[in-house]
C-alpha cells in the first residue's frame, strides 16, 4: 500500500490529539453495543448486559485502550502494518477465533468516534486517510485467516 505524505500527515495530526484510553474505551464500548454479537468474545469481562453496564465496565475500557495503543503502532508505521500485526493476527485467528469481519466493524466504529470527537478537524480527506488505514489494519489482522 502506498501512503502519500498528505495521508500520513492527516493521520498523525489527528492521532497526536487522541486520548487513547478515552477513544479506545469509547470505541470498544460502541462496538459491543452496536454489534452485540461481538460480546461473545468478551465473556470474561463480566456484566455486558446493557449499554450502561458496558460503558461502566473497567475491563472493556482497559481493553479498548490496549487495542488502540496497538493501533497507534500502525499510525507510526503505516508501511509496516502487516509485520506489526502478525502476532495479533495469529492470536485472533488461532486462539480467539474472531471472525475477521469484526476488525472491519471496529475500524468503522473508530472512524465514527474520531469524527464525533474532532468534528470540523475530521475533514473528508482525514476521513479518507483513516478509512485507508483501518482497512489496511483489518486486512493485516485477517491475514492469518487466509
From Swiss-Prot:
Q: Where is the signal peptide?
A: none
Task: Name all Globin domain ranges.
Answer: 2-146
Q: Which InterPro entries match?
A: Globin (IPR000971), Globin-like_sf (IPR009050), Globin/Proto (IPR012292), Hemoglobin_b (IPR002337), Hemoglobin_oxygen_transport (IPR050056)
A single GO CC term for this protein reads: hemoglobin complex
GO molecular function annotations of the record: haptoglobin binding; heme binding; metal ion binding; organic acid binding; oxygen binding; oxygen carrier activity; peroxidase activity
Q: Where does heme b bind?
A: 63, 92
Q: How does it assemble?
A: Heterotetramer of two alpha chains and two beta chains. Oxygenation results in dissociation to dimers.
Q: What is this protein called?
A: Hemoglobin subunit beta
What is the source species?
Answer: Erythrolamprus miliaris
Chain's gene name: HBB
Amino acid at each position: 500500500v502506498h501512503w502519500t505524505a498528505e495521508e500520513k500527515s492527516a493521520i498523525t495530526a489527528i492521532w497526536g490529539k487522541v486520548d487513547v484510553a478515552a477513544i479506545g474505551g469509547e470505541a470498544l464500548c460502541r462496538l459491543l453495543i452496536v454489534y452485540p454479537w461481538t460480546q461473545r468474545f468478551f465473556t470474561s469481562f463480566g456484566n455486558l448486559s446493557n449499554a450502561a453496564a458496558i460503558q461502566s465496565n473497567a475491563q472493556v475500557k482497559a481493553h479498548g485502550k490496549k487495542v488502540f495503543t496497538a493501533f497507534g503502532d500502525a499510525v507510526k508505521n503505516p508501511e509496516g502494518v502487516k509485520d506489526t500485526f502478525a502476532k495479533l493476527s495469529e492470536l485472533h485467528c488461532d486462539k480467539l477465533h474472531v471472525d475477521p469481519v469484526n476488525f472491519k466493524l471496529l475500524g468503522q466504529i473508530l472512524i465514527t468516534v474520531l469524527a464525533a470527537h474532532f468534528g470540523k478537524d475530521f475533514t473528508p480527506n482525514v476521513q479518507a486517510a483513516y478509512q485507508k488505514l483501518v482497512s489496511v489494519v483489518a486486512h493485516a489482522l485477517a491475514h492469518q485467516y487466509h
